[in-house]
Every structure is written in C-alpha cells, then in structure tokens.
Amino acid sequence: MSQYITNPRQQSRQLRRNSPSGQEPHFATSSVPLNQRNSILDPHLSVLQLLDRADPPSELSSLKHGEIAKPATPRRSGFESVNCSISESWQSIKHTDCSMVNTQGDATHQHAGILSSSDTSEDEPDAQLSPSPNNFAFPNSATSIFPEAPHNLEASSLREYQNSEIANPREENDNETVTMSLMNSSNSFVMPKLSLIQQSQKFCILIVGKPAQRFYRDIPRAYHKMFEVRDVGHLSPREMNKYSAVMVIFGEPKEGKELLEKVAAHNSNIIAVCQRGQQQQISNILNRYSKSNEIRLVYHLTVMSDHQDVHRLLRYLNTLSTEVDSGYETEVGSRKIRKRRKSSKKRSPQITVNRWVIWSISLTVGVGLGYCISCLLSSTSSTLSVTLRSGDEVTIMEDIHNSPHESPFDNYLRHLLLAVKRAVKQVNSSFKQYLSGQSLPVLWMQRIGKEWLSEASDPTLPGVTALDLVLV
C-alpha cells in the first residue's frame, strides 16, 4: 500500500530518473504502469494537464498583457509551476479587460426593452433598460458621482458641495417636479414631488365643561381613545381646531352660554350634553346658534344621566370614527343630525275618519240585531188569531196561551225579556234622536219614511221601516 500513498514530489523525481532524455514525462502516458499511475491526486493531475494543453494566447491579449510589466518569477517545475500559474491568473484580470469584453459583446447582443403604448418600433435598442446580464457594466463608483476623480477636484468646490448638502438636508418644495423619460421613443411626463410633511388628522373629540371629568370616568374604557379632556382656557385656537369635534358638558345654563361662545369661535362641530331638567333652556341656546350657522350639531341634545341615550351616542361616534379613519368620509358631521325618535306619533286624519265610520257601523248593526231578537221573542210568547169576516173588518181574537199552567221560572224569564226589550227600545230611540240632530241625511230619510208610512194601514210596518232606515 506504500506505493499508492507516495509523495507527488518523490514520484516525479523517480520518473525523471527513469526517463532516458531527462525531460519531464507526461503523467497520463500509457508507458507508465497502471499500478504507478493510481494515486489519490490522479484526477487533479488530469485537470492540470488539460490546463497545460490550453490554446496559445491571442494577439489582442498578448498586446494587453505586454503593456503591463510583470515581475520576473523564478522558473518552477512540476506542480509548483502549475499551481503558481493558476493562482496568479485571476490577479492579472483588470477592470479594463471586463469593460473591453462588454464593449465587444454589445455588437452581437440582441437587446430586449420594455414596450409602452407610445412605442412606434419594437426593434429599437435600449441598452440602459435592458434586463440582460450581459449588458451590465462595471463603472467606477467615483466617476459615476463626479465628472472626474475626487482627488482632481478643487478643495473649494468640494467644500461648497458639502456645505450645500448640510445646509438643506430636509428642505422640501411642493412646487418642485421631476421629469422622467421612459424610453427614447416615448413621451416624457411630469411627476409632481410628493410631500409627507402634513400628517392625516386623527379622529379625536375634546370634552370641555365642569362635569367633563365625571363624564369621562363614567364611559367605558373602550371609548376612552376617542376623547380627550382639557381646559378651554389653556388651549390655543390652533390646538382646538385640530380636534374633530368638541363635546360641551353643560353644568349651568348661564356658564354654558359663555363656554359655547368660546368653543364655537374656533370649532363649529358641537356635541351637546346637558343635565336633567335643562333640556328646554339648552335647546333654545343651541337653536339660536345653529340658526346663525355658528355651530353644527353632530348629534342631538343628550341628557348625561340617561345611560341608554349616552350609549347610543358613543356607538354613533365609534362608527363615525371608523369611517373617518378608513377614508369613507372626510368631514365629521357630514351626516344629517340624528333626531330623537318620539314615542307618541301624530294620528293622521284618515285614521280618525275610519275609526268614526267603524264605530257608527258597529252600533247600527248591534241595535238592529237586538231589535230583531226582541221581536222574535215576543212573537213566541203569544199568538194572535186573526179572522177576516169581510174585506173591511178585522177582528182580533183573544190571546191563546201556549201552556195553561205556567211555571215560576218561565214567568221570570218572560219579565226579564220584556225589560230587555224596553231597554233596547229606549236606546234605539235615543240613538235615533242623536243621529237626527247630528246628520241632515238621517233627518231627511226619517221625513221620507213618515210620509211613506202614513199611507200604510198596518201598525207593525213603522217599526220595521224604522229599523231598515237605521241599517241604511
């Protein structure tokens, strides 16, 4: 196994001694036995032999390398010379060689550009916008910023350039524009320079008034982020104008009027909250200011002790803040003012007329049914025997009772029915008098009925006819 792990230098010396001419033998020749060529470095030696057999350098590269003076290197033999040539080869590459290769490859490279709607030709080359890696150049960083090397610049001009950058580090001009050209064949457009100095206004409501702290403590903590409690005397007009709205908590009507005047001068979006019993006075003050367009009510007047109304107010403000933060509404109070829903609704005149008609019809039907029932009951209690002796004479016979012997219960029932019948007749007569005095059509119908009934000889017809008139 020792012959397979021999040192490469010893192996090369042994081969040099065995060679008759004293020249360096090739490592991959067939004259060397197989057991002598098998070693760990055989694959690497084959690669080195291929590098030695490379083509001779071209004229262009020989001229380029001839201009650069190389230090004299001692001649080495075997593996040392090969390793040194490989290690020194990458150091001999200069930036000029890379740029020369790129300039030579530009002629044969097919350019690919970005097409736009204003392009007239698709084959126009554009080397700056081409995404190909072969088009990538290696410019010097100093020459890309300055027109000449930094050490060639004068000290005064460099100092002026640095001072100008230090003097205006964050100066921005909104009127400044940037002109960009997409391609050589495309039209240029003007892009305005955006400014991020002004930040978007955050939805926040200022609470003022003596009971402001108590109101702020009573509301849930989830709504605290929307409010801020401060004193009006310590606020400048600019700070008060930053708030989306101002919630005025009225303690006393006299002090509330002065407080409302201070707030309305700088912020017109008002949310009014008063104490119980002050609704009429505070509403008069608010109406006076709203008619003169000095304030704008975001929500209707709310009582501080009414927890349900306060909860509805907080929910409304929460939804309003969500819409403002999301950008759906740009101004607080753009909605219409929410008005309190009244529990008592005004009755329309149509409903009133319909109710009177229904009541009159129901009373008429009830009286008519009662009269019919009383007539039927009276006819069953007694029967009349009528005999006609001649066409001009009518005789009424004696009443023939159904049963000769009456029980006390039947007698009591008959008296009760008679009493009900009399009561119904009295009610009917009084109702007729009321209707005759109230409505002219009923009076006219009664007059017609009397004239028509006066000609009739049967005494039972007037009652039936009067019932028909009432039903009509």
From Swiss-Prot:
The chain crosses the membrane at residues 356-372. It comes from the Eukaryota. The keyword Membrane applies. Residues 58-68 have a biased composition (Basic and acidic residues). One of its GO terms (cellular component) is mitochondrial outer membrane. Keywords: Autophagy, Membrane, Mitochondrion, Mitochondrion outer membrane, Transmembrane, Transmembrane helix, Vacuole. One of its GO terms (biological process) is autophagy. Residues 1-35, 58-80, 113-139 are annotated as: Disordered. Residues 129-139 have a biased composition (Polar residues). Disulfide bonds: none annotated. It is found in: Mitochondrion outer membrane; Vacuole membrane; Preautophagosomal structure membrane. It is a single-pass membrane protein. Mitophagy-specific receptor that recruits the autophagic machinery to mitochondria and regulates selective degradation of mitochondria. Mitophagy contributes to regulate mitochondrial quantity and quality by eliminating the mitochondria to a basal level to fulfill cellular energy requirements and preventing excess ROS production. Recruits ATG11 to the surface of mitochondria. Also promotes autophagy-dependent peroxisome degradation. Belongs to the ATG32 family. This is Autophagy-related protein 32. It comes from Lachancea thermotolerans (strain ATCC 56472 / CBS 6340 / NRRL Y-8284).
